[in-house]
Amino acid sequence: MDAFATSPTSALIKAVNCIAHVTPMAGEDSSENRRASNYKPSSWDYEFLQSLATSHNTAQEKHMKMAEKLKEEVKSMIKGQMEPVAKLELINIVQRLGLKYRFESEIKEELLSLYKDGTDAWWVDNLHATALRFRLLRENGIFVPQDVFETFKDKSGKFKSQLCKDVRGLLSLYEASYLGWEGEDLLDEAKKFSTTNLNNVKESISSNTLGRLVKHALNLPLHWSAARYEARWFIDEYEKEENVNPNLLKYAKFDFNIVQSIHQRELGNLARWWVETGLDKLSFVRNTLMQNFMWGCAMVFEPQYGKVRDAAVKQASLIAMVDDVYDVYGSLEELEIFTDIVDRWDITGIDKLPRNISMILLTMFNTANQIGYDLLRDRGFNGIPHIAQAWATLCKKYLKEAKWYHSGYKPTLEEYLENGLVSISFVLSLVTAYLQTETLENLTYESAAYVNSVPPLVRYSGLLNRLYNDLGTSSAEIARGDTLKSIQCYMTQTGATEEAAREHIKGLVHEAWKGMNKCLFEQTPFAEPFVGFNVNTVRGSQFFYQHGDGYAVTESWTKDLSLSVLIHPIPLNEED
């Protein structure tokens, strides 16, 4: 189908770059009656970040050649003959080292072979084997019923007490339980049982390696972890194991550093773009390019998706600024003008806005139109109507929240979340990523519009991102003058304490993950990359908001991980 066939002609943009005439009325921003955001300046050196675009590691070419040889060796390991449990453990290690994308087909083939094997003696009475098999199969799109855990229950229907001593089995059960669906009560019981008992023994585990794995899992289960972040931690952890495979470890290090060098060049180019926009000089909004690049790597780290990361990071950096305009800086009249301009996707009327807000708006238009132009040039598809629609919907949601604040209206939790799962902004990034990666035979005006309509998969992604954001940021945002968040909405609606409200929101997180998990198995019109993007944006949020607001404020844990994931290569042995 012709990509232009059903597109509204009004959405066909005549020029990529918008140039506005700024009148004296828009010349200065009055600070009178504007709320202060009190954001700290970015702690990142943008000159250094820009230099990453041209940095060259001469050893990298040598490592790439060595990595290709090691890759074939690892492929042979995966396909080799071994005991079923050993095969599962190897696949688990390969995935945790961040190498799943290199061996996708081999892993799926081996897991299918184990799944179709009629023999169950090797796993049916072994909690570790049963749980590891369950998790790996579900992670890779092969459904296994929860009933496989029934054999580990006693006559009263509770998990057998002797399992409390099986720490490795408990750990595998714990990780498996996070792939449960709504209504899978057995997995809920497994989560509670394994969590309680692992917490009871975590300080007394004799094996240092197993003890570290348990504490790491209790802090963040694998299913909720971003693959790239997890790989950086696990590479160091795997190196400490007694039975480490040296060539597998070496390949993981090589691959991590090779991908990191690609990310560094991308980050350098993005830093240059950011400085050229001039928006890095605006002090009333957040400067979050580095955080957004980390988020982009959580969403999709694989080298072949550089254009997806580039668009996602640019849009997310602008979204943070637009969000701050609506939440704190702009007057209600200015916000209505801003929303109208975006809704029309026409800069007529921009002279009614202050200069600083106009700069953000124009950069937003120019960036979106450039992304749309690249889509048309590279894929023959006009994506601008869909990107513009996503921006318009987002700004309308922001405006609704601003009106709530200015009028003193207190929404119910349900009303807040219905608006908030879109105002969290990930629909825009997901729409753009869909346009960039969907197969051309399936990419139509209607299919792109469907993504914009927030179907169930996108809805769960938005809801989880919103809940994580609120758990990490609500107190600070309300202190800045932002609208009530989910925690405060629940407190107002029910009279609950803040502690009780937080526990309720955490419960909603677990329930929303169950809905997301089920979506991953349901018939979907989406190709695999897009499905993964939805889940991975949530994993990025989990990281940034796990211990507070690691997004708006560059906390030590976010900066340390950013340095280890993006800046500092993994040290190699001298002979490498």
Curated annotation (Swiss-Prot):
GO terms for biological process: diterpenoid biosynthetic process; terpenoid biosynthetic process. It holds the Pfam family Terpene_synth. Pathway: Secondary metabolite biosynthesis; terpenoid biosynthesis. Its EC number is 4.2.3.112, 4.2.3.16, 4.2.3.-. Mg(2+) 3 binds at N469, T473, E477. Binds 3 Mg(2+) or Mn(2+) ions per subunit. (2E)-geranyl diphosphate binds at R286, D323, D327, R466, N469. A motif (DDXXD motif) lies at residues 323-327. Keywords: Lyase, Magnesium, Manganese, Metal-binding. Its cofactor is Mg(2+); Mn(2+). SUPFAM superfamilies: Terpenoid cyclases/Protein prenyltransferases, Terpenoid synthases. It comes from the Eukaryota. It catalyses: (2E,6E)-farnesyl diphosphate = beta-bisabolene + diphosphate; (2E)-geranyl diphosphate + H2O = (R)-alpha-terpineol + diphosphate; (2E)-geranyl diphosphate = (4S)-limonene + diphosphate. Mg(2+) 1 binds at D323, D327. InterPro entries: Isoprenoid_synthase_dom_sf, Terpene_cyclase-like_1_C, Terpene_cyclase_plant_C1, Terpene_synth_N, Terpene_synth_N_sf, Terpene_synthase-like, Terpene_synthase_metal-bd, Terpenoid_cyclase/PrenylTrfase. GO terms for molecular function: (4S)-limonene synthase activity; magnesium ion binding; terpene synthase activity. It is an enzyme of class 4 (lyase). Transmembrane segments: none annotated. Mg(2+) 2 binds at D323, D327. The Asp-Asp-Xaa-Xaa-Asp/Glu (DDXXD/E) motif is important for the catalytic activity, presumably through binding to Mg(2+). Belongs to the terpene synthase family. Tpsb subfamily. Monoterpene synthase which catalyzes the conversion of (2E)-geranyl diphosphate (GPP) to (R)-alpha-terpineol and (4S)-limonene, as well as small quantities of linalool, myrcene, (-)-alpha-pinene, (+)-sabinene and geraniol. To a lower extent, catalyzes the conversion of (2E,6E)-farnesyl diphosphate (FPP) to beta-bisabolene. This is (+)-alpha-terpineol synthase. It comes from Santalum album. The lineage of its organism: Eukaryota, Viridiplantae, Streptophyta, Embryophyta, Tracheophyta.
